[in-house]
Amino acid sequence: MSELRFVRLGFGEQAVEYTEAWQKQREVHADRFEDRVPDTCLLLEHPPVYTAGRRTAESERPLDGTPVVDVDRGGKITWHGPGQLVGYPIQKLPRPVDVVAHVRRLEEALIRTAADFGVETSRIEGRSGVWVLGDPVERRQALGGLSLDFDPRLQDEEFDPRLNGPEYAPSNAGQRREDRKLAAIGIRVAKGVTMHGFALNVNPDNTWFDRIVPCGIRDAGVTSLSAELGREVTVEEVLPVAERHLRDILENAELAPRAVEQPKAAAPAPAPA
């Protein structure tokens, strides 16, 4: 991959309104498609805002009527705001684009970032993002032959079967206490170039998530680096660490197009008798 350029758009009092950053994404996306700029990662904070991906249901929006910006990324509703490091990597990928591989690269960079601050995180089968796994619990006894545990894959509309493999923790079917999401990822690819990206919770006010069903996932919580460590961590501290891991992962990735299964050749017609 080409050298990755970082652009710090604004943090703290200079946080960037979501619609302004979205327009900036579109401009950089067009420039990247035409090869006028290299692969670029926009880094910033937003003022408080809810954004809804294409598959957000009405029941998942804020119950109090708080305004929501509808966007063209995948996934469902989430919140952005102070204390959250947001990154929009705008990269040209080989076609057909392997979106899952791109998501995994972003997850790996954020997993390494969290590890540098002493927070152990993981992927979870079927779910994008970076997670702190819930503590193990003893297997609960069946009641009258009916197990009290459940398989979330049967009820989770967000479960993505492509997100699996040895690097993923198994779905939480009661064997752990509530898993907690540290970083959300939502991607769009247009003309072979990525948009949108990740949001890493550093030290936000997590009560903003109480008004919605974050990412459409009802059986998990939300956390932050500060909450997990029990001390204040700032976006300013995390920014250079995240940049280092994003550069290392994204610049050194061996990009390959998505494997496409070839149609099987038709069996030859039987010879006439």
Swiss-Prot record:
CDD domains: LipB. GO terms for cellular component: cytoplasm. Gene3D superfamilies: Bira Bifunctional Protein, Domain 2 (3.30.930.10). SUPFAM superfamilies: Class II aaRS and biotin synthetases (SSF55681). Its EC number is 2.3.1.181. The keyword DNA repair does not apply. It catalyses: octanoyl-[ACP] + L-lysyl-[protein] = N(6)-octanoyl-L-lysyl-[protein] + holo-[ACP] + H(+). The record marks 181 as: Lowers pKa of active site Cys. Residues 35-254 form the BPL/LPL catalytic domain. Keywords: Acyltransferase, Cytoplasm, Transferase. Pfam families: LplA-B_cat (PF21948). The keyword Lyase does not apply. It is found in: Cytoplasm. The active site is at 215 (acyl-thioester intermediate). GO terms for molecular function: lipoyl(octanoyl) transferase activity. It is an enzyme of class 2 (transferase). PROSITE patterns: BPL_LPL_CATALYTIC (PS51733), LIPB (PS01313). Substrate binds at residues 73-80, 184-186, 197-199. One of its GO terms (biological process) is protein modification process. InterPro entries: aa-tRNA-synth_II/BPL/LPL, BPL_LPL_catalytic, Octanoyltransferase, Octanoyltransferase_CS. Pathway: Protein modification; protein lipoylation via endogenous pathway; protein N(6)-(lipoyl)lysine from octanoyl-[acyl-carrier-protein]: step 1/2. Catalyzes the transfer of endogenously produced octanoic acid from octanoyl-acyl-carrier-protein onto the lipoyl domains of lipoate-dependent enzymes. Lipoyl-ACP can also act as a substrate although octanoyl-ACP is likely to be the physiological substrate. Belongs to the LipB family. In the reaction, the free carboxyl group of octanoic acid is attached via an amide linkage to the epsilon-amino group of a specific lysine residue of lipoyl domains of lipoate-dependent enzymes. This is Octanoyltransferase. It comes from Streptomyces griseus subsp. griseus (strain JCM 4626 / CBS 651.72 / NBRC 13350 / KCC S-0626 / ISP 5235).
